[in-house]
Structure formats: C-alpha cells, structure tokens
Amino acid sequence: MVQVKAIKAFSDNYIWCLTTSNNTQAWVVDPGQAEPVLDYLAQHNLTLAGILITHHHYDHTDGVAKLVSENPNIAVYGPTNSPFKGITQQLTDGQSITVLNTAFNIIATPGHTLDHICYVNEQLAFTGDTLFSGGCGRLFEGSAEQMWHSFNKLRELPADCKVYCTHEYTQANLAFATAIEPRNPELLAYSKRVDELRSKNEITLPSTIGQELKINPFMRSDLPNITELLPKEFCSVTKNNEPWENFAGLRKFKDHF
C-alpha cells in the first residue's frame, strides 16, 4: 500500500513523497526544490524512482533538473501540452500509470493553468493547484467554466478519497469560506480544527473529497444560494445562474478578499 508523506518546501509548499513498506523506492510529486527532497531521501534511506508533475509553474518544477542529475535514469511524468520541458513521459486525459504497483488515472484539469493534470484513484488524489482544502487555484490561464468542469471531475471521486494539494493555504481559504457560508456548521467545525493544527504548526492535509463537498465554496458552486453574500460587483445573483457563473463570482471575490 502506498504511503504518502509531506516534504516541506519554500514557505508553504508540500512535495508529496510516495513510498511503500516493502521497498526503498520513492516517487515525488511537484518538486519545486531539490534540496528538501534529497535530504528526505538520505534521511530515510530511499532511492528516487520517479517524479510526477501536475503543471508547469516554477514552484512545482524547479527541483526537477537537479533531481534528475542525481538520478539520471528516473522518469518524469507530466502533461503532454506543458511549457515545462523536463517531462520525459507525457500524459493526457484518460491515461493511467502505475506507481509503486498502484494505478493512477490522469485527469486533465485546466483552469489554474491550461496544462494542469491530476493523478487520482479511488483512495488518493494529487490535485496540485487545482483543488485546495477550502479553496482553489487562481485562474492564471484558463476560464472559470473550464475550472468548474475540472472540479466536476474531482467531485465524482469517492467521498473518502484523500486530497493532497500542494500548498498550505487551508487556514486562509477557510477565512474566505466562512465569509461565504457563515452558518455552515461543518465549515465552522473544520475551521476550528484547522486553527488548532496551525497554532501548533502542524499540517492540515490531506483533506477528503467528502470534506471538501461540505466546506469548500468552490466545490459547492452548484448550490443556488452559494453566492448570496457576494458583493454584487463580483456576481449577479439569480436563480438561473449556471454553477460556473457562481464559481467565477466566488473566484473574483477571493482574488480581492
């Protein structure tokens, strides 16, 4: 069974390290820095076997070159249409790969960037900068309609599927979420737990798909009243709004929150 551990990088990034109990191989997801990965591998007597990339941003890819130079035979998996040129195994929507004897499906999730993909199965979802706990990535390249379509793919995963995103943004995301749904009891309870974890400098991840469907306003954009507290300059609230229009309004407000 795959075990997932967080390697901290930069100020708020997590590089996810995948291992199993019966061998010394490791895979990492979105290594924005090489040094924390190399240190972790050395401390735990692990050998790097491969790299998974969700999208091209530097804080997800800058460590790749050094890691490959130290481990020249490893594969670097990533999206086929990516501006990042360090990918050796290109992936498209609907493909599957095997990592440590575990199958992952590739889901194209454009929105944050156009090349973004997620690596998912029924137990684990590596969502990069698409889905955060309590939030979502900024729309740097794609549209709100694209991002909502991407979210709909993730919403179909099992409720107990664990969500491993790449940033410790949970506390800030929940401050926004509670401004949107101040009477959501699940959200208020989750926010309290997250505050307690962060007060001890502990990680708030992984979340689960089921948890996000209860507390993440972006995952709940299909609810007709989700935008009722938005300032009108960000979203015209009508009963006929498409979910992606609600999503767009939420994202615009979050950008100014």
From Swiss-Prot:
Q: How is the cofactor bound?
A: Binds 2 Zn(2+) ions per subunit.
Q: Give cofactor(s), names only.
A: Zn(2+)
Q: Which domain of life is it from?
A: Bacteria
Residues annotated for Zn(2+) 1 binding in this entry: H55, H57, H112, D129
Under the heading InterPro entries, the entry gives:
Clx_II_MBL, Glyoxalase_II_hydrolase, HAGH_C, Hydroxyacylglutathione_Hdrlase, Metallo-B-lactamas, RibonucZ/Hydroxyglut_hydro
The UniProt transmembrane annotation reads: none
- Keyword Ribonucleoprotein on this protein? no
Q: What class of enzyme is it?
A: hydrolase
Picking any one GO biological process from the record gives:
methylglyoxal catabolic process to D-lactate via S-lactoyl-glutathione
- Where is Zn(2+) 2 annotated to bind? D59, H60, D129, H167
Instruction: Fetch the SUPFAM superfamilies from UniProt.
Output: Metallo-hydrolase/oxidoreductase
Q: What is its EC number?
A: 3.1.2.6
A Gene Ontology molecular function term for this protein is: hydroxyacylglutathione hydrolase activity
State the protein's purpose: Thiolesterase that catalyzes the hydrolysis of S-D-lactoyl-glutathione to form glutathione and D-lactic acid.
Q: What does the sequence similarity comment in the record state about its family?
A: Belongs to the metallo-beta-lactamase superfamily. Glyoxalase II family.
Quaternary context: Monomer.
Protein name, as recorded: Hydroxyacylglutathione hydrolase
Organism whose genome encodes this protein? Pseudoalteromonas translucida (strain TAC 125)
